[in-house]
From Swiss-Prot:
Belongs to the SINA (Seven in absentia) family. Residues 1-49 are annotated as: Disordered. Pathway: Protein modification; protein ubiquitination. GO terms for molecular function: ubiquitin conjugating enzyme binding; ubiquitin protein ligase activity; zinc ion binding. The lineage of its organism: Eukaryota, Metazoa, Chordata, Craniata, Vertebrata. Residues 20-29 have a biased composition (Pro residues). This is E3 ubiquitin-protein ligase siah2.
């Protein structure tokens, strides 16, 4: 059983008399107006901050606009390649093109634009999900990793399996589930019983149910799959139809109970942004094999007691 802990170190305030810091040096622009230098000249230093929150200055916005890809309008990031006339296109779009989208010149041979790469190292780029609410601007080396986990990226359908390709905003997830996955039932209350029927069905099977409490919807998922060859296992987990930050406010408890036996798991629910695949891969959920399932099952039906609670601040 794994119980998450919300305790952490307390912040302390400095006390006593402190020395006054020396006056700051005269203000210098954060970006050079021009780039010059002969052979062997080094690139301008990268900004010390890897990310900032909030709008960029007008000058900075004009500079980042020079890196816009004319095809997808995302930013052209290092390694930066140009056409024979000097026009830029991002690496993702370049792989699909045979000629420059701006001047129709050939994109081969590949010509590296080292000057723009040096400028890119001194610029912070807005997250690609800025239009949906993200206010972060990041160094180009940090941008892809952030965008993979950005809270403002589109939500995928949280149902197990890859058959549904729907994507949309968090506000539209429940509407999608209601209209496109009508077989999913919803129970209300903090304590419910998740009944999985016919657990002896062969092959990979999943069971899904919704639980509504604390003004939120939680998705209960039970999957049976052969994670290791010849060894079928069950994986049970709870997802919040919400953000990671919202999920941290709750805890869930899964319990198998019967025949004077008890098996429990307690954890923080995952956001549907994270999905169930990573949790199953890392066994970060309630895991039991078919032999244990049969100890708690009744005529091929398995009841899992599910309790949702709020975490103390």
């Amino acid at each position: 059983m794994s119980r998450p802990s919300s305790a952490g170190p307390c912040a302390s305030k400095p006390c006593g008399k402190q020395k006054q810091p020396p006056p700051p040096p005269p203000h210098a622009p954060s970006l050079p107006a021009t780039i010059s230098g002969g052979p062997g000249a080094s690139a301008p230093p990268a900004p010390t901050a890897a990310a900032i929150t909030g709008p960029l200055s007008q000058q900075h916005q004009e500079l980042t606009s020079l890196f816009e890809c004319p095809v997808c309008f995302d930013y052209v990031l290092p390694p930066i390649l140009q056409c024979q006339a000097g026009h830029l296109v991002c690496n993702q779009c370049r792989q699909k093109l045979s000629c420059c989208p701006t001047c129709r010149a050939s994109l081969t041979p590949s010509i590296r634009n080292l000057a723009m790469e040096k400028v890119a190292s001194a610029v912070l780029f807005p997250c690609k999900y800025a239009s949906t609410g993200c206010s972060l601007s990041l160094h180009h080396t940090e941008k892809p990793e952030h965008e993979d986990i950005c809270e403002y990226r589109p939500y995928s359908c949280p149902c197990p399996g890859a058959s549904c390709k729907w994507q949309g905003s968090l506000e539209n997830v429940m509407q999608h589930l209601t209209h496109s996955h009508k077989s999913i039932t919803t129970l209300q209350g903090e304590d419910i019983v998740f009944l999985a029927t016919d657990i002896n069905l062969p092959g990979a099977v999943d069971w899904v149910m919704m639980q509504y409490c604390f003004n939120h919807h939680f998705m209960l998922v039970l999957e049976k799959q052969e994670k290791y060859e010849g060894h079928q296992q069950f994986f049970a987990i709870v997802l919040l139809i919400g953000t990671r930050k919202q999920a941290e406010n709750y805890a869930y408890r899964l319990e198998l109970n019967g025949n004077r036996r008890r098996l429990t798991w307690e954890a923080t629910p995952r956001s549907i942004h994270d999905g169930v695949a990573a949790a199953i891969m890392n066994s970060d959920c309630l895991v039991f094999d078919t032999a244990i399932a049969h100890l708690f099952a009744d005529n091929g039906n398995l009841g899992i007691n599910v309790t949702i609670s709020t975490c103390c601040p």
